[in-house]
Design a protein with these regions (language model features):
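Single conserved hydrophobic/aromatic residue that forms the stacking wall/gate
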Residues: 1-7, 11
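C-terminal "cap" of GNAT-fold acetyltransferases
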Residues: 9-26, 197, 204-212
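Conserved N-terminal entry element of GNAT/NAT acetyltransferase domains
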Residues: 18-45
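A conserved beta-strand-loop-helix scaffold within acyl/acetyltransferase catalytic domains
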Residues: 37-147
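Conserved GNAT acetyl-CoA-binding A-motif
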Residues: 140-141, 169-182
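Conserved beta-strand-loop-alpha-helix junction that forms the acyl-donor binding cleft
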Residues: 148-153, 179-189
Length: 212
């Protein structure tokens, strides 16, 4: 089993033309809407549960994924949604306001953790807050979560998602984006990077031995 992470540039001034055309076409064809929030409490109330339910629905077919329990979902909604910069969170809904796609990203905390040697005290908390909320951020962002409802996969919904997010990344001064580990054989997620300059710079292998 092979999983890899990819880094992509997001500094270009314009979204690729083909990418933009696909996103506009998909939005009209399926009557999709982009939803943005400015309140963590509001997004948690409206879509907190649905975000992680969609994650379970989209990821369950993938090798090694264990669906989140209701207790875990409740904890993530309470702990993580309030600390996100909601400019970097995009929801896509259908005509009935049902969630069909979500993208969640945040500034990379790697540099902050390096400065504090992985410790929260005495100053580790400051570096983390600086990375998350202050104007001078890291140049790298982490693509934490992209989930698409199964019946909308392979239809270009990802293009609509990133057409909304990329201008935000540029405005905030990010240069690179890094994905979470992706299965090499997951063609759906690999295909979404076809329109970007990417570099695979990490690789993980899992070896399985049958025990008799």
């Amino acid at each position: 089993l092979l999983a890899s992470s990819a880094a992509s540039d997001v500094y270009k001034r314009q979204i690729p033309d083909k990418h933009k055309r696909i996103s506009e076409l998909i939005q009209r064809k399926y009557n999709l809407k982009i939803k943005k929030y400015t309140s963590g409490r509001k997004i948690a109330k409206d879509y907190g549960q649905k975000i992680f339910e969609l994650m379970n629905e989209a990821y369950s077919p993938l090798y090694g994924y264990s669906p989140l329990t209701q207790r875990q979902i409740d904890q993530y909604v309470k702990m993580y949604l309030p600390i996100l910069d909601l400019r970097m969170v995009t929801l896509i809904t259908d005509a009935n306001d049902e969630l069909v796609c979500v993208g969640i990203s945040m500034p990379s905390l790697a540099e902050a953790l390096q400065k504090s040697n992985g410790r929260l005290l005495p100053l580790g908390w400051f570096y983390l807050l600086k990375a998350l909320f202050m104007k001078r951020r890291a140049k790298m962002l982490d693509l934490l979560l992209v989930a698409v409802k199964p019946e909308y996969q392979n239809k270009g919904v990802n293009a609509l998602l990133f057409s909304d997010l990329i201008p935000v990344y540029q405005k905030l001064g990010f240069i690179f984006a890094e994905s979470n580990p992706e299965l090499e054989l997951n063609g759906k997620v690999q295909a979404q990077w076809d329109y970007f300059e990417t570099q695979q710079h990490k690789r993980r292998r899992a070896f399985i031995k049958e025990i008799k």
